[in-house]
Amino acid sequence: MIKISRKQYASMYGPTTGDKVRLGDTNLFAEIEKDYTLYGEEIKFGGGKTIRDGMAQSASTYTNELDAVITNAMIIDYTGIYKADIGIKGGKIVGIGKAGNPDTQDSVNEAMVVGAATEVIAGEGQIITAGGIDTHIHFISPTQIPTALYSGVTTMIGGGTGPAAGTNATTCTPGKWNMHQMLRAAESYAMNLGFFGKGNSSNEEGLEEQIKAGALGLKVHEDWGSTPAAINHALNVAQKYDVQVAIHTDTLNEAGCVEDTMKAIDGRTIHTFHTEGAGGGHAPDIIKAAGEPNILPASTNPTIPFTKNTADEHLDMLMVCHHLDKKIKEDVAFADSRIRPETIAAEDTLHDMGIFSITSSDSQAMGRVGEVITRTWQTADKCKNEFGALKEECGENDNFRIKRYISKYTINPAIAHGISEYVGSVEVGKFADLVLWKPSMFGIKPEMILKNGMIVAAKIGDSNASIPTPEPVVYAPMFGSYGKAKYNCAITFVSKIAYDCHIKEELGLERILLPVKNCRNITKKDMKFNDVITPIEVNPETYEVRVNNTKITSKPVEKVSLGQLYCLF
């Protein structure tokens, strides 16, 4: 038997079981738990390599030949951290394991035959993750979509109609006409999209109309009046049509305090946006909601991780996004009530404890649409550096923490909004929304983004160069983003009632439309690696946060990982 060193093996086929990989310039190390490829039978494309006719590429005719295979990929997912080939057919993941030619190789997965029909994407030395899911989008500008895509986000859920005052402040697409217009606009993009209707109404017929018009859920926002009545009516309609309700609660406590909101919610499942409160919500103690079993708590990315500049930058953001005036003292007091360093300091720690379940952006409305993934990993790194390894870790690695944090922007938002059957993880049967990263660039600069198995965006060099790599290397849309291909590379998520009533045909849409499902029968316990339920207390005078009588806080950092080292500007 021929043996080679681990270093030589990794340089040829990527790391294998027991190897550790550093994520970007963070202090996080992922260790491969299992290698599903077969030593000596690895498949690899290139001159003198194995994917050639009659070798690792079958010369026989198989009906299950793959459309594409990602070879020797290191997968980081809530399901595990492991090495495998990924087989793609018809836009979906059909196999994870050993791909190749069953006529000449052992242990080839019968669903993963490489043949004349198969394109090869080299995964050696790359990390593969599921595409990110951002569930807090203000659709203020369509230019957000490529920015998010180039960061590794493949699904955007939110509301709005453009740079209107209502959209600048709230994630709502109000009414049937606006909803239909946004569904039509979605046709232009190789990005999964879904839209919230406006959930603030004591008239349930108006809410139902929006669900029937194609809304995948409702958003209740304080700028429209997050009253107990509005909350109750929105949840009534959501229960009826199996959609999710997202909420931005009442900062000013005009219609009630956090206890009144929880009473109106009445144990029903709801997705709470920016649950820390700087982005909005009952001052000073909306953060208490994060510990409840029916609350799916999320953060928006300006407050994570907590840095020396976090509190200062929030005041100006708030004045702009919520149509406030610095010359009006009541507006300034409103802004000041939301920016509390004590609760912001607790937020990172609550994420690390698995109490906060989801991260999102709040795009252009106190949030950065291209930084969900980056800030999630910055927070993970900050917490490791401050608090050390989690007690759940096994061995000299950070695998548990890594699974906890990747779940926050992949599987958990998918579960929360009823789309986890389709996207949110690297699993057989799901659409192949996948992101490839060099380990050194992990979390900030992806190499390539696949939607439904086709490359829709990637880093690419000078188009007039003789090879693909010369500078300037920039992100650009790829063929999956063009022509009619984009209709098969992206999904619009709608309510089941709209899907069943053939909204696609009614509006003449060409994209894939799919219904959300199982939004109402989930709880915090369904949040992967982030399901901790515990009482949280907030001191109303000092804003100190406590869990089990222990003060929860963290220090503001002077410098973050995945920062200026990777960015010219």
Swiss-Prot record:
Q: What is its main location?
A: cytoplasm
Question: Cofactor(s) for this protein?
Answer: Ni cation
Q: Which reaction does it catalyse?
A: urea + 2 H2O + H(+) = hydrogencarbonate + 2 NH4(+)
Modification comment: Carboxylation allows a single lysine to coordinate two nickel ions.
Q: Which residues bind Ni(2+) 2?
A: 219, 248, 274
Q: What is its EC number?
A: 3.5.1.5
Name the domain of life this protein comes from. Bacteria
Which residue numbers delimit the Urease domain? Answer: 131-569
- Key words, A-Z: Cytoplasm, Hydrolase, Metal-binding, Nickel
Which pathway does the protein contribute to?
A: Nitrogen metabolism; urea degradation; CO(2) and NH(3) from urea (urease route): step 1/1
Q: How is the cofactor bound?
A: Binds 2 nickel ions per subunit.
Q: Which residues carry this modification: N6-carboxylysine?
A: 219
Output one GO BP term. urea catabolic process
State whether keyword Cytoplasm applies. Answer: yes
Give a GO molecular function annotation for the protein: nickel cation binding
The positions flagged as active site in the entry are: 322
User: Gene3D superfamilies attached here?
Assistant: Metal-dependent hydrolases (3.20.20.140), Urease, subunit C, domain 1 (2.30.40.10)
Q: How does it assemble?
A: Heterohexamer of 3 UreA (alpha) and 3 UreB (beta) subunits.
Which named protein is this? Urease subunit beta
Q: Which organism is it from?
A: Helicobacter hepaticus (strain ATCC 51449 / 3B1)
